[in-house]
Amino acid sequence: MKRIGILGAGTWGMALARMLTVSGNDVLVWSAIEKEIDSLSTTRKHPNLPQMKIPDELRFTKNIEEVCKDKDILLFAVPSVFVRSTAAKARPYVADGQIIVDVAKGIEPDTLYTMTEILADELGKEGGPKGVRLVALSGPTHAEEVAIDLPTTIVSASPDVEAAQFVQEVFSNSVMRVYTNEDIKGVELSGAMKNVIALGVGISTGLGYGDNARAALITRGIAEIARLGVAMGCNVHTFAGLAGIGDLIVTATSMHSRNNRAGILIGKGET
């Protein structure tokens, strides 16, 4: 049994929290929204995951120090725009050498940092830990499916191979297969850039175009992402894997995908 602290109680954070709890881990979830914590702990239901029952063993807290202290893994599951501010709040309580897992996807506009680069920057400031072990967890994963134990694959990415393998071991179970990859930059870049292509695919659908156009956008889209990644020092093979083409396919084709749905509405002229 591992002790896991999760910062963020959105759909992805809660789907993972349930999965990790069912696997026998001691999981504690924190949210900056106190009403959210009250509702989740009382109703044992998440409003955006109606089919998911929150296990009685899964615990909640409003205290950020409590969620950070004495944990084998500290998982950041807040939206990308809140990763830096949440890291700043957590900084005084993060232990030296702590394994930090990020599941948010995106690029910070002002710095062009990936999410783990933001965490390294913010946690490295005065009053923070003396080094952390950063892992990005990314792939073709909709929370709606993980929440009801549908088969899923994901990538644990870090240049720290031992940390990536530790996360692989903790998150693996009968319905979740975890692969490792040392190319954390490529994995994170894939997770951010696929949203742009998925939006375009949705727009093409909304305009009434067919499968031919969607296939072209997905295929040429991953080629563009790969070229950008290689120029930034990433491994080209990353983009042909789960975190690359895999994540792009699921985001560009599924109605679970907000980017796909938004694109469809744009294409129809409804937004």
Regions found by a protein language model. Give the residues of each.
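Internal alpha-helical scaffold of NAD(P)-dependent oxidoreductase catalytic cores
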Residues: 82, 93, 118, 125-133, ...
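Rossmann-like NAD(P)(H) cofactor-binding subdomain of soluble oxidoreductases
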Residues: 54, 61-69, 73-149, 167
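Glycine-rich phosphate/pyrophosphate-binding beta-alpha loops
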Residues: 142-143, 205, 248-255
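Divalent-cation-assisted or electrostatically stabilized phosphate/pyrophosphate-binding catalytic cores
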Residues: 254-271
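NAD(P)+-binding Rossmann beta1-loop-alpha1 motif at the extreme N-terminus of oxidoreductases
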Residues: 1-53, 59-62, 89
